[in-house]
Structures are given as structure tokens and as C-alpha cells.
Swiss-Prot record:
GO terms, biological process: response to abscisic acid; response to salt stress; response to water deprivation; triglyceride biosynthetic process; wax biosynthetic process
Function: Bifunctional wax ester synthase/diacylglycerol acyltransferase that uses acyl-CoAs with 16, 18 and 20 carbons as substrates, preferably in combination with 16:0ol alcohol. Involved in cuticular wax biosynthesis.
Disruption phenotype: Normal wax ester loads on leaves.
Organism the protein comes from: Arabidopsis thaliana (Mouse-ear cress)
Main location, first listed in the record: membrane
SUPFAM superfamilies hit by this protein: CoA-dependent acyltransferases (SSF52777)
Gene behind this protein: WSD6
EC number: 2.3.1.20, 2.3.1.75
Subcellular location: Cell membrane; Endoplasmic reticulum membrane; Golgi apparatus membrane
Annotated protein name in UniProt: Wax ester synthase/diacylglycerol acyltransferase 6
Alphabetized InterPro entries for the sequence: CAT-like_dom_sf (IPR023213), O-acyltransferase_WSD1-like (IPR045034), O-acyltransferase_WSD1_C (IPR009721), O-acyltransferase_WSD1_N (IPR004255)
Basic and acidic residues bias (residue ranges): 1-17
């Protein structure tokens, strides 16, 4: 695939009043240093569909007024030897930013698009980006603008950041702070209200207002006991996972022991958020519960087919009647489920920071939950939902995410970056996949005057052959898969299975409702 780029020759650097290139220096946080370790060199990529033809000059001018005013996006990473030169310190150093060095306007040759398949061309383009590291002599971000009409967008923008700039939640919030509502260009995007209080705490509050103080006290004590027990169990499982507890070697589990840097394939699919909300409201769950349950069903369908194809390939069961499933009866398949621990940093806070130079909390504030998927075919697809909800409800009544965050900081400070990176890498290598779910705007938004059709963020660089990201936007949900193509060569079939599972569960919910009305 041949891609030619052009750059604006005009001077677009952001100049400070001070003539010195280096304005200030700030040490990298321990988490940021881990993301630069060879075992854990992670990047965030977000593919953004645009409704109209992109005007690069407008985008560049908008970036000058917003994104590069953020300290991390106008700082480069500098390593300095200390003492005997065996130890190095890494710092963020403010620098002048030439925006056109970071904005790549791709001159796409239409004859290179095989069979006119622009979607496949986009996937190849993004996959190629995973093999090219960012230039550390400049701030660690890029924006690719593609004049490419795909099945779901008129043009496409691809944002690429190094994960050391911040966690996925803060980076996406920063991107959203650069955007405005299409209906009102002066207004920031609106996110759905999040009620962070759990059902457990709501019940406790209700009990405290009731007549039975004794019952309320019993509930409080029982809840505290379960919190401690769940946290201890989860902590022991995490320690065991770090040391020896491995997932089953399934067709979707990768091996990153010998190759730390691989070409990854990124694909996405957009489905109706209304379908997910219908299931959510009927089953009295959250959107995240539904997404986990559907993912469990989709993974079960995909693995069943992969195991069946494997048996056919080796010639097993050719003369006998095919069993109901070719999967092993007991499969341990766990996901590292990312949890945002950040006190709410709103889009407004980030917009004010870029406009006025104010400060707000920034960095990598994420914990992990080890979530076990119950893999298997079910006669009743709603069993996948109930099982996923039961597990995640127990995980919510645990301090596992906070504990992994605190333990990570302790290991970093006590043993250093290299040891911490190896421990995290080992823990993730013993699980199968990563999973995250981000809440997006509820109204159409524009990227410097360019209306957006979808956003598909993803991450690569960690030791998983499969990463699933979910991003809501307006009335749709975009599923992004990052896969190792040597392990999962058919990611679109996995997306097909996910979508079919969603429709199967939706049909089961509607059938149950119709029976209850009869």
C-alpha cells in the first residue's frame, strides 16, 4: 500500500514569549515510565468517522487553539543519565510545537484500493500505524487525515497517542473537549448522567430512613464483611495470576513471550444502542452488564466454531455424529477489565485548562479487575446476561480495582519500573484479553466544524491477542477489536458473532415480555 503525504510549508509552530525552547520540566510519573518499558510499550489509537470532506487547514488551526495548549501535547520526553549512567531519569520538557509535523494529510492513490474496498484499505492503513513508533524527539501524538470514503463515513481521521500521555478516559475526555455540539458550535459535548452510587448503597440509605434500624445495621455489617471477603479473594486471585494461574490455551489466546512488538489489526462495528438499552431496561441491568453478557455469548459462539474447524482440520469426528459443541467443558478465559479510578475530570475542566492555562488532575488513574467469562453454549441466551451481571456485581462489591492501582504504585516505588513492567506483563499474559467501555456524547458533535459519525478508540502494545473496546455515541455503540492477526485471522467473524448474540438476546427478552403479557 503506497501512501503519499503532503505538508503545509507555512510556519505553524506555536511560539512562546520566551525565546528559550525549554520552558519547564516535569518528571514522568511512575505509570508513564511503565508505558515506555519494552514489555509494555502501549499506544492509543482512535479512528473517527467524519460526515464531510476534511479541510486540513481548519483542523490545523483548531489544534493550535486547543489540543497543543495541553502540557502533555506540547512536551517531549527527554532521558537523562544519572550517576554512573546506568540509571536514567525521564522528564516531560515543554517545547515549541510545529503542528504540521504531527498532522499527516494522506494522499491516497485510488488505484491502490483493491476492488474499491475502502473499509479494508482503512484497516490496512491503521494496522500499518501499529508497526511505526512515534518520534520521541517530538511530542508523542499524531493525527492522520484521510480523504477516504468508507461505508460509514465520508472521510476519516486517525488519532494516535502514546499511552504515557494519560489513560484512555482522560485522553478521550481531552479529545471531546476539543469538540463542540453540531447544533450549537459554542457548546461542549454532553455526556449521560452517571449515577455512581451502587444499588447496595441505595438500599442502605433506604434502610437508614426506614423504621427498622436493626435491619439497617445488619445490612451495613453484612455489606462490610462481604466487601472484605470479596477483596481478599480477588487479591489472592490476582497474586496467583501473577505467579502461576494461567488461562486455558484457547484459539484466541496469544503468546507474546518471544515477540514484544507485533503488527496488530484494528476493526470496528457499529450497532444500535437502543437495542442494548431495551435489554438493559427489561432485565434491570446497566449498559455495561449487557455489553459483558453479549460479549460472553459472542465469544462462546466464536470459540465453538474455531474448535470445530480445528477438529475438522485434523480429521476428527468425520465419521461420527457431530457433538453439540466441540469446545472443552471447562475453559478458563479471563479479561483484564479496565476501571477508571479518576475523580471526575469533566470535559469543561479540560476545555478551561486549554483555554486559560488552568490545571486539573491528569495522568494514568486506572485499576484492573480480573473478570472471568463463562464460556459455553446456552439454550437460554439470557443466562449469559445473568451470569455476567452476577460476577460484575460481586466485583463491584470489592476493592480489587483500587488494590491493583495501589499495589502497582507500591511496586513501582519499591522495585522500580523494570520490575513493575515485568510483573504487570506477566499478570496480563496469564489472562486472555482486555476489555473496556467508554461513555460518549448523547448528541452529534463536530471536530472543528466536521460532524462525526462514529468514534472507535483502541489500545495496543500490551500482551493480549484480543482487546475489546466499546464506545457509545448518540444512539449507537461502536465495538472496536484490536487483534493479533496471527492468532485471530478473522476478526470480522467475531464481530458477526457479537452482533448475532445481541439480536438473539434481544429476541429472547422480547419473547419473555410477550409471554408475561399473555
Amino acid at each position: 500500500m503506497e501512501i503519499k503525504t503532503r505538508r503545509d510549508t507555512s510556519e505553524t509552530s506555536v511560539r512562546k514569549d520566551d525565546e528559550e525552547e525549554v520552558e519547564e520540566e516535569q518528571p514522568l510519573s511512575p505509570a508513564a515510565r511503565v508505558f515506555h518499558a519494552p514489555e509494555f510499550n502501549c499506544y492509543v489509537i482512535s479512528v473517527i468517522g467524519i460526515k464531510k470532506k476534511i479541510d486540513p487547514d481548519v483542523i490545523i488551526e483548531g489544534l493550535k487553539q486547543t489540543l497543543i495548549r495541553h502540557p502533555r501535547f506540547s512536551s517531549k520526553m527527554v532521558s537523562t543519565s544519572v550517576g554512573n549512567k546506568k540509571r536514567q531519569t525521564q522528564s516531560w520538557v515543554r517545547t515549541n510545537v510545529v503542528v504540521t509535523d504531527h498532522v499527516i494529510v494522506s494522499d491516497i492513490q485510488t488505484q491502490n484500493i483493491e476492488n474499491g474496498n475502502a473499509d479494508a484499505f482503512l484497516e490496512t492503513y491503521v494496522s500499518n500505524l501499529t508497526t511505526v513508533p512515534l518520534d520521541i524527539s517530538k511530542p508523542l501524538w499524531q493525527l492522520h487525515l484521510l480523504d477516504l470514503k468508507t461505508s460509514d463515513a465520508e472521510n476519516v481521521a486517525v488519532l494516535k497517542f502514546h499511552h504515557s500521555l494519560g489513560d484512555g478516559m482522560s485522553l478521550m475526555a481531552l479529545v471531546l473537549a476539543c469538540m463542540r455540539k453540531t447544533s450549537n458550535p459554542d457548546e461542549l459535548p454532553s455526556l449521560p448522567n452517571q449515577n455512581r452510587s451502587s444499588s447496595r448503597s441505595s438500599r442502605l440509605m433506604a434502610g437508614s430512613r426506614g423504621d427498622s434500624r436493626f435491619l439497617w445495621l445488619v445490612m451495613v455489617i453484612w455489606s462490610a464483611i462481604m466487601l472484605v471477603l470479596n477483596t481478599v479473594c480477588d487479591a489472592l486471585e490476582f497474586i496467583a495470576t501473577t505467579m502461576f494461574l494461567k488461562d486455558t490455551e484457547t484459539p484466541i489466546k496469544g503468546d507474546f513471550r518471544f515477540s514484544k512488538s507485533k503488527r496488530m489489526c484494528l476493526v470496528h462495528r457499529t450497532v444500535s444502542l437502543d437495542d442494548i438499552k431495551l435489554i438493559k431496561n427489561t432485565m434491570k441491568m446497566t449498559v455495561n452488564d449487557v455489553v459483558l453478557g453479549v460479549s460472553q455469548a459472542g465469544l462462546s459462539q466464536y470459540l465453538d466454531r474455531r474448535y470445530g474447524e480445528k477438529k475438522k482440520k485434523v480429521g476428527e469426528d468425520q465419521d461420527s455424529k457431530r457433538k453439540a459443541t466441540d469446545m472443552p467443558k471447562r475453559i478458563r478465559l479471563r479479561s483484564a477489565l479496565l476501571v477508571n479510578l479518576r475523580p471526575n475530570t469533566g470535559i469543561q475542566d479540560l476545555a478551561d485548562m486549554m483555554a486559560k492555562g488552568s490545571t486539573c488532575r491528569w495522568g494514568n488513574w486506572i485499576g484492573y479487575i480480573v473478570f472471568p467469562f463463562s464460556i459455553g453454549l446456552r439454550d437460554d441466551p439470557l443466562q449469559h446476561l445473568r451470569r455476567a451481571k452476577r460476577i460484575i456485581d460481586r466485583k463491584k462489591n470489592s476493592l480489587e480495582a483500587a488494590l491493583t492501582f495501589v499495589a502497582g504504585k507500591f511496586i513501582l516505588k519499591t522495585f522500580g519500573v523494570q520490575v513493575a513492567a515485568k510483573i504487570i506483563n506477566r499478570a496480563l499474559s496469564n489472562t486472555t484479553m482486555s476489555f473496556s467501555n467508554l461513555i460518549g456524547p448523547i448528541e452529534e458533535i463536530s471536530f472543528y466544524g466536521h460532524p462525526i459519525t462514529y468514534m472507535a478508540p483502541s489500545v495496543y502494545g500490551h500482551p493480549h491477542a484480543l482487546t475489546m473496546h466499546f464506545q457509545s455515541y448518540m444512539n449507537q455503540m461502536t465495538i472496536s477489536l484490536t487483534v493479533d492477526p496471527t492468532v485471530i485471522s478473522d476478526p470480522h467473524r467475531l464481530l458477526d458473532d457479537w452482533e448475532k448474540s445481541l439480536q438473539s438476546i434481544k429476541a429472547a427478552v422480547q419473547e419473555r415480555d410477550s409471554r408475561s403479557l399473555d
